[in-house]
Amino acid sequence: TAVLKMSELSPLTASRLGELALEAGIPPGVLNIVHGYGKVAGEPLVRHPDVRAISFTGSTATGQRIVREAGLKKFSMELGGKSPFVIFDDADLDRALDAAVFMIFSNNG
């Protein structure tokens, strides 16, 4: 089974992924969605004895906390990077710029 805990700023995306998994035929309970802030929802997952591996994308500071708390669990991390952003030829450039700035700086880590 897998547990998905996405950013608290994107709860609808996480919920939709869960719905799509069910629609694709993945049995209930195989993909589990958890909503909440990192300290409240993420830390208990990192510490839980039944969690064998952790994949995390976010800030270096949070990654360091996960490494300290994870013990001997396997982990994969993408830390401190910037989000890729595709702007198509027919895009409204003012809206695209606003969206890029929002996504880069509003969901850091």
Pin down the residues of each PLM region.
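A structured beta-alpha segment of the ubiquitous adenosine-cofactor-binding alpha/beta core
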Residues: 32-55
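Hydrophobic packing residues within well-ordered alpha-helices of enzyme cores
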Residues: 14-17, 45, 66
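ALDH superfamily catalytic-core signature
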Residues: 47-48, 53, 61-109
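Conserved small-residue-rich beta-alpha loop and adjacent elements
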Residues: 1-29
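Residues that line or immediately flank small-molecule/substrate-binding pockets and catalytic motifs
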Residues: 58
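Short beta->alpha connector loops at strand-helix junctions that form conserved
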Residues: 5-7, 35, 88-89
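Short alpha-helical
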Residues: 9-12, 39-40, 61-62
